[in-house]
Amino acid sequence: MSRRCELTGIGPMVGHNVSHSNIKTKRRFLPALSPASLQSDSLGQTFKLRISNAALRTLDFRGGLDVFLLGAKDEQLSPRALKIKAQVKAKAKAAATAVAA
């Protein structure tokens, strides 16, 4: 399992530990990932994704999984998240055509 957020694409970054004597040694900054069960309002399903804690706060701020996925770029999303996004788009399109008819 990769250390990458399934919604934002945030992965490990590289930097330095800097000692008091200013000696730099390489280190990795790993994202704070946690498994989360996210509810889709339009689909009525729960999805288990491994996302960063920052992504979880962003989901709450934007108003839920569906809104976040519809506004996210496809390059950032994992293949699982892309499938969920396609399902949400199809459901929204079906609802729009039902209202128009």
Curated annotation (Swiss-Prot):
<dbReference type="InterPro" id="IPR034704">
    <property type="entry name" value="Ribosomal_bL28/bL31-like_sf"/>
</dbReference>
<comment type="similarity">
    <text>Belongs to the bacterial ribosomal protein bL28 family.</text>
</comment>
<protein>
    <recommendedName>
        <fullName>Large ribosomal subunit protein bL28</fullName>
    </recommendedName>
</protein>
<dbReference type="InterPro" id="IPR026569">
    <property type="entry name" value="Ribosomal_bL28"/>
</dbReference>
<dbReference type="GO" id="GO:0003735">
    <property type="term" value="F:structural constituent of ribosome"/>
</dbReference>
<dbReference type="InterPro" id="IPR001383">
    <property type="entry name" value="Ribosomal_bL28_bact-type"/>
</dbReference>
<dbReference type="InterPro" id="IPR037147">
    <property type="entry name" value="Ribosomal_bL28_sf"/>
</dbReference>
<keyword id="KW-0689">Ribosomal protein</keyword>
<dbReference type="GO" id="GO:0006412">
    <property type="term" value="P:translation"/>
</dbReference>
<keyword id="KW-0687">Ribonucleoprotein</keyword>
<dbReference type="Pfam" id="PF00830">
    <property type="entry name" value="Ribosomal_L28"/>
</dbReference>
<dbReference type="GO" id="GO:0022625">
    <property type="term" value="C:cytosolic large ribosomal subunit"/>
</dbReference>
